[in-house]
Amino acid sequence: LEQEDFEVEIDEKTVLVLDTSKPIFDREPQDFSFFDALEIESAGFGLNTILPALEMASSDDKIIGISIKNMSAAGGTSNLIALRNGLKKFKESGKFIKAYSDGYTQADYFLASIADSIFVHPEGLVDFRGLSAEVMYYKSAQEKSGVTMEVIRQGKYKSAVEPYLFDKMSNENRIQIKTILSDVWSEMVDD
């Protein structure tokens, strides 16, 4: 996007509000004019719009900070990490970031943790559960329905087809998933 796509009139000492109540996508959803006629609200925001806007805001002397309004930071861990990194760059410009929510999920708090100050409603909820992974297995269902799968697999650490071959997780897949979750958790905690 070009800079003129973002140009708006900004007053002195402006605080930007980042409302995360809608999903955050890699790319902005396409704007189809027929949605306007149906009065359908925007489905969410794209990192391709948010990150350049944060970069421009970091160098705009009229903008003094950002207020993150966390109502449910939906968008997947990778998108939240990218957004948080964009906020970190904004903060490195010497401007403040504040965060407020009626309650924080783990994802909300991860995003808000880049802020200088985090506020929660006095009767709000903070819900941390850690990370988990679930795998659905189909072998028994296939046997009951008479369906058989023809699978070719080489090596122990090839788990994509496991749900069709087994009724439970193999030790190798358990190790892989545990490693991925540990890496993601470490990234979240270290930041």
Predicted regions and their residues:
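Small-residue-centered hinge/linker elements
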Residues: 1-191
